[in-house]
Structure formats: C-alpha cells, structure tokens
C-alpha cells in the first residue's frame, strides 16, 4: 500500500471587499470602497455584576436571564438617583450636580441600612479618586 499524502486544511481566499465603480465626467471610472457597518455597542453592567458575584459567592453562577434582570435593576436605580439629584440641584438653583446632591439622593432613594452603606462606599470612592 502506498503512503497517504498529508491533508492540509483548506485555505480560504480572502473575501473581496465591497467596491463600487463610479463613472467620472471624462469617461473613466473610479473605485470607491464602502465602509462596513459598525456594531453599536451597548453598555451593560454584566461584567461588574459577575465580578461582585464571584467576590461574594465564588462557587455560584448566574443565568443570562438573571443577569439581564440585574442589569435592568441597576439601570433603574441609577435612573432614580439621577432624577432625584437633578431635582435637588433645581430646588437649590444650582446648575451642577455635585457629590453632595448624589449623596442626598442616595439617602432619599435607598432604604435605611442600604443607604448608609452606599454613602460610606461612595465617600470612600470619592476620597480615593481625589487623592490619586
């Protein structure tokens, strides 16, 4: 029996780029390359939710549906905080939302113990940011 030749994986030829010929006044044509459509990036908190989950419970996973719910929850909370801090700035006739408005909004929107922890973590984050 003759030895079999080695098979190499089939190489794909590069796909031709989308080109369009446009006729000029002098009868010549010019090739114009079309730009590819870029994917619109949607910002989510999924990676951050996952990081926090692994810090709290390293052995537990989360389903895609639950991750979507958590992402919606965080968006809702941030929306409420933004509305409340905006309202506070308007009440005080201030053109800028500062950390003080955010802190007050957190105290108004979040309940009891959760607000205390959020304020302390926020203060810690602002201190770390300003010191660096």
UniProtKB/Swiss-Prot annotation:
The modification N,N-dimethylalanine is found at residue 2. InterPro entries: Histone-fold (IPR009072), Histone_H2A/H2B/H3 (IPR007125), Histone_H2B (IPR000558), HISTONE_H2B_site (IPR055333). Keywords: Acetylation, Chromosome, DNA-binding, Isopeptide bond, Methylation, Nucleosome core, Nucleus, Ubl conjugation. SUPFAM superfamilies: Histone-fold (SSF47113). GO terms for cellular component: nucleolus; nucleosome; plasma membrane. Residues 1-11 have a biased composition (Basic and acidic residues). The keyword Lipid biosynthesis does not apply. The keyword Cell membrane does not apply. GO terms for molecular function: DNA binding; protein heterodimerization activity; structural constituent of chromatin. Can be acetylated to form H2BK6ac, H2BK33ac and H2BK34ac. It is found in: Nucleus; Chromosome. The modification N-methylalanine is found at residue 2. The modification N6-acetyllysine is found at residues 7, 12, 20-21. The modification N6-methyllysine is found at residue 4. Its main location: nucleus. The modification N,N,N-trimethylalanine is found at residue 2. Residues 1-41 are annotated as: Disordered. There is a cross-link at residue 128 (Glycyl lysine isopeptide (Lys-Gly) (interchain with G-Cter in ubiquitin)). Belongs to the histone H2B family. The nucleosome is a histone octamer containing two molecules each of H2A, H2B, H3 and H4 assembled in one H3-H4 heterotetramer and two H2A-H2B heterodimers. The octamer wraps approximately 147 bp of DNA. Core component of nucleosome. Nucleosomes wrap and compact DNA into chromatin, limiting DNA accessibility to the cellular machineries which require DNA as a template. Histones thereby play a central role in transcription regulation, DNA repair, DNA replication and chromosomal stability. DNA accessibility is regulated via a complex set of post-translational modifications of histones, also called histone code, and nucleosome remodeling. This is Histone H2B.9. The lineage of its organism: Eukaryota, Viridiplantae, Streptophyta, Embryophyta, Tracheophyta.
